[in-house]
Amino acid sequence: MLAVYTLSVSFAPGASVLPGSRVVSRNAALSMEVKPVVIGVAADSGCGKSTFMRRLTSIFGGESKLLDIGRETNTLVSDMTTVICLDDYHKWDRTGRKSNPEWPDGITALHEACQKWDKMAQDVTDLKAGKTVDKPIYNHITGELDPDETVSPTPIVIFEGLHPMHDERVNAALDLSVYLDITDDVKF
């Protein structure tokens, strides 16, 4: 069986990870007063986004762990990176998607109409500006929308999910866009 992986990467005009072109140590980079680099990673369900995020986080240093808020969360954090799962920006919980009057036959969470685009755009913009945000949580276990969690920016902030480049405001705030295209026989 031949597995085909395609990785498409694009940089926003003028984007840079660190000021200038000099190489600095990890500790020096952490102490620099720079705005976070914001990365969007898009891929279909089952393509390995979460696995890719854990490995990417380990490359940038630090062990990724779930944000410790005493309940279920999808947010991975380390000294250098914060990974935010865009599932957290679902507009409705599982029950709401099944019984929504706008969608009498129900609607899947994968549909673009099921996303909180305004909140997502505001959080991306605020984190890029170095501000702390209170972001929603979609609980995959219960299918409910849990109370918000507080997320502080790190030098690298990654938004991963199906649609990080769909909304013009979110896409404009991304310094780097990555699309993972995995063949169906490799997924899951």
Where are these regions (language model features)?
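N-terminal chloroplast transit peptides
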Residues: 1-21
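P-loop (Walker A) phosphate-binding loop of NTP-binding proteins
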Residues: 44
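ATP-binding Walker
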Residues: 47
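Walker A/P-loop
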Residues: 50
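Short beta-strand-centered segment that lines the nucleotide-binding/catalytic pocket of NTP-utilizing
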Residues: 62-94
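Conserved nucleotide-sensing/catalytic segment adjacent to the nucleotide-binding pocket
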Residues: 82-85, 89-142
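ATP-dependent NMP and nucleoside kinases share a basic, alpha-helical "lid"
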Residues: 146-188
